[in-house]
From Swiss-Prot:
This is Histidine--tRNA ligase. Its main location: cytoplasm. It is found in: Cytoplasm. InterPro entries: aa-tRNA-synth_II (IPR006195), aa-tRNA-synth_II/BPL/LPL (IPR045864), Anticodon-bd (IPR004154), Anticodon-bd_dom_sf (IPR036621), His-tRNA-ligase (IPR015807), HisRS-like_core (IPR041715), HisRS/HisZ (IPR004516). GO terms for cellular component: cytoplasm. It comes from Chlamydia felis (strain Fe/C-56) (Chlamydophila felis). It catalyses: tRNA(His) + L-histidine + ATP = L-histidyl-tRNA(His) + AMP + diphosphate + H(+). It is an enzyme of class 6 (ligase). PANTHER family: HISTIDINE--TRNA LIGASE, MITOCHONDRIAL-RELATED (PTHR43707:SF1), HISTIDYL-TRNA SYNTHETASE (PTHR43707). Belongs to the class-II aminoacyl-tRNA synthetase family. Homodimer.
Length: 430
């Protein structure tokens, strides 16, 4: 029987020519990941890599009533009966690592990650059972300008990869006085309309009231539309905090708007929450989101510690780049050596190693195809330069390099060719 992928997953690999699936091309993922590393480095964030699986309790602390915890986790028992879960989201493992490694001894901890997540999602466009997330967590500081800084990093990432039509939507879920006031009013409002709510929202009424605002059920939409806004009940202190974030975004010319119905899918968010929205082809959809989660560290067994962060689904980023026509695969500027005769094999093997030591990406075609077919393969493999090596080249000690894009050639001794290749690579825009 032929082996095949399970549902909900996909391969990322280099030999993709179908435009529809170009978002899965290895080179594109490398380009986007390079942007992430560069942007995070500019802001002083360091990469963290947590295990693929954690003790299940790590995610239960993050919100027992969230859809992820209740319906979507890949949970299993190991051979000793311990409950383990494949990582469904990135924040809870970072918090676990923060506590485990006593990082609270530092005043300010700034982390980012690019990791696969696992959720038993219903099959639909843009949703996968293994997906990849760029996440960022800033733990230890509570300040409105820290929140704005995190948002500016997110915005710089979207700009650097070439996404268009982006906007940040924000809301303030509050904590303390603000949340108490709002919960009371919201509960009374939904109680008046309880019989008209969907079965899912009726369940959430007693477990996570705010999540009703996030309902996608048809029967809930008119009720949600008329629900009171939390911004009508925000305390003076919280309003000042929120205003400072908005002022900072204005100062950086980051497009944004307030969405008083915005809540997040995980239970641990407090105070400011946000989503990055793109509008394309008449549709709006989120490419990432996050907020402040000042209570999660303490809920996970650590000291009371403020924190904020976000997560970005990279599959949607790649697919949106494709839809917007902004996918450009980076050039590798590689040289392909083609030994025309077997007596040139040893020369190509040794010279290729020397070229790589000079920083010139070099590969060798060992197939000994007919010359015409070998050049076709070099073209298909996106080789920038090609060098044919046969008996004539070995005897004359003169080599010819062909530029596959301009179809121009240059010849010389081995040393002359090396210098020309280095010049071409260093002076050509990648």
């Amino acid at each position: 029987m032929k082996v095949a992928l399970p549902k909900g997953v996909f391969d990322i690999f280099p030999y993709i020519t179908d435009a529809k699936h170009m978002w899965r091309h290895t080179s594109l993922w490398h380009r986007v990941e390079d942007v992430i590393h560069e942007v995070c480095d500019l802001y002083g964030f360091s990469e963290v890599r947590t295990p693929v699986f954690e003790k299940s309790e790590v995610f239960l602390h993050a919100g027992e009533q969230s859809d992820i915890v209740k319906k979507e986790m890949y949970t299993f028992l190991d051979k000793k009966g311990r409950s383990l879960t494949l990582r469904p989201e990135g924040t809870a493992p970072i918090v676990r690592s923060f506590i485990d490694n006593s990082m609270n001894q530092r005043d300010d901890n700034k982390f980012y990650y690019i990791l696969p997540m696992f959720r038993y999602e219903r099959q639909q466009s843009g949703r996968y059972r293994q997906h990849h997330q760029f996440g960022l967590e800033a733990i230890g500081v509570r300040h409105p300008l820290r929140d704005a800084e995190v948002l500016s990093l997110l915005w710089n990432f979207y700009s650097a990869v070439g996404l268009q039509g982006m906007q940040i939507q924000l809301n303030f879920l509050g904590g303390g006085t603000t949340r108490q006031r709002y919960d009371k009013v919201l509960r009374e409002y939904f109680l008046e309309h309880f019989e008209s709510l969907s079965s899912l929202s009726k369940e959430r009424f007693n477990t996570n009231l705010l999540r009703i605002l996030d309902s996608k059920e048809t029967e809930d939409q008119e009720i949600i539309k008329s629900a009171p806004s939390i911004l009508e009940y925000i305390s003076d202190e919280d309003q000042k905090y929120f205003d400072e974030i908005l002022t900072a975004l204005n100062s950086l010319d980051i497009p944004h708007s307030i969405n008083p119905k915005l809540v997040r899918g995980l239970d641990y968010y407090t105070d400011v929450v946000f989503e990055a929205i793109t509008t394309f082809g008449g549709h709006s959809y989120a490419l990432g989101g996050g907020g402040r989660y000042d209570g999660l560290v303490a809920a996970s067994g650590g000291p009371s510690t403020p924190a904020c962060g976000f997560g970005v689904g990279l599959e949607r980023v790649m697919q949106t780049l494709l839809a917007q026509g902004n996918i450009t695969l980076p050039s590798s500027h590689k040289l392909r050596l083609i030994p025309v005769e077997s007596q040139a094999d040893s020369f190509c093997f040794i010279w290729a190693q020397h070229l790589r030591g000079l920083g010139i990406p070099t590969e060798i075609d060992w197939t000994h195809k007919k010359l015409k077919n070998a050049l076709k393969t070099a073209d298909a493999e996106k080789a920038t330069f090609v060098c044919l090596v046969g008996e004539r080249e070995l005897l004359s000690e003169q080599l010819t390099i062909k530029d596959m894009s301009s179809r121009q050639e240059f010849s010389g001794s081995k040393q002359e060719v090396e210098q020309r290749l280095l010049y071409e690579i260093q002076n050509t825009s990648l």
